[in-house]
Amino acid sequence: MTKAIFPGSFDPITNGHAEVVEAAARMFEKLYVVIMTNTSKKYLFDEKERLDLAKKVFENDKNIEVIARPAELTVEVAHELNAGAIVRGLRNTTDFNYERDIAGINKTLDPKLNTVLLFTRPEDSFISSSMIKETVFFGGNVSTLVPKPVAAALEEKLRNQNNEEK
């Protein structure tokens, strides 16, 4: 069975992420969406919330499993799951340069583990989790940029934060 992992912080999952997951799920018999930690990011959703949201987004996909591995190296997660590939999504050349460097580190750690890069659609190439959070923070509507469960969770999170500030 060909297995792959799609690691990320997914704070929150965007339509671009979902698009890459769906494309990868057609390429591999089993795809693990792995909720991980990026130490350089400030999170809006905690690990459990990110895990639950991802599970909701992909609940109808039989060959996709969502798991959390917040304190492990990507290569170690791939080994643990017997995955032969790491899937990463690209929006632009900035992403390419970043992902090339990560793929190089991963290849150094495990020369047999490959990275598969998938491009998002041009209409999704500007979407980033950071921009989504910023837009929501200032009251913008992102419902066309994220899956429905994510849009609802963002609205609720914003409402709760606004209530706490009052």
Curated annotation (Swiss-Prot):
- UniProt: substrate binding residues: 9, 41, 74, 88
Main location group:
cytoplasm
Which GO MF terms are attached to this record?
ATP binding; pantetheine-phosphate adenylyltransferase activity
Site positions (Transition state stabilizer) = 17
Q: Please tell me which top-level EC class this enzyme sits in.
A: transferase
Q: What is its EC number?
A: 2.7.7.3
Entry keyword annotation includes Repressor = no
Q: Which cofactor does it need?
A: Mg(2+)
Q: Pfam families given for it?
A: CTP_transf_like
Function, in words: Reversibly transfers an adenylyl group from ATP to 4'-phosphopantetheine, yielding dephospho-CoA (dPCoA) and pyrophosphate.
What is known about its subunit structure?
A: Homohexamer.
- Which named protein is this? Phosphopantetheine adenylyltransferase
Q: Which organism is it from?
A: Lactobacillus gasseri (strain ATCC 33323 / DSM 20243 / BCRC 14619 / CIP 102991 / JCM 1131 / KCTC 3163 / NCIMB 11718 / NCTC 13722 / AM63)
